[in-house]
């Protein structure tokens, strides 16, 4: 199996990418807020740039929207691949990890983001005991 190619950039180069992404995505009126998360944020070497966006209204085709936005980002971000995911309706674990481990790229409406965080954290912690039981019984993992 082939290894993923990693990119190793200075903090200045990463900051330049963040500025480019923020400018592009903040200019999109349908995006209320965005998180940057994943290896680009957590490690010196990254494989892709993970961006989670919250939309005011969902498009007819979520996949088409994500691919179109990824293509736009690829035109302004180098090096690397940008992986866009929509937070609206995303799995709970994804939403929680984007909030917990990522950082806010921008927000246009802090109340909307605060509501999103409140709902996500509430659902996550309500579900946590069931997740622990599942992991223990199905996978033998103690949490």
Give the positions of each predicted feature.
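Short beta-strand->loop micro-motif that forms the acidic, two-metal-ion catalytic signature
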Residues: 50-54
């Amino acid at each position: 199996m082939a290894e993923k190619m990693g990119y190793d950039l200075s903090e200045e180069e990463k900051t330049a990418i963040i500025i480019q992404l923020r400018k592009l995505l903040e200019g999109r009126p349908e995006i209320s807020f965005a998180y940057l998360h994943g290896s680009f944020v957590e490690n010196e070497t990254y494989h892709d740039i993970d961006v989670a966006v919250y939309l005011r209204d969902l498009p007819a085709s979520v996949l088409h929207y994500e691919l179109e936005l990824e293509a736009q980002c690829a035109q302004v971000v180098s090096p690397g691949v940008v992986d866009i995911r929509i937070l609206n309706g995303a799995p709970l674990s994804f939403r929680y990890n984007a909030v917990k481990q990522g950082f806010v790229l921008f927000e246009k409406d802090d109340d909307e983001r605060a509501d999103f965080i409140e709902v996500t954290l509430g659902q996550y912690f309500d579900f946590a005991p069931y997740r622990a039981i599942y992991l223990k019984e199905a996978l033998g993992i103690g949490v």
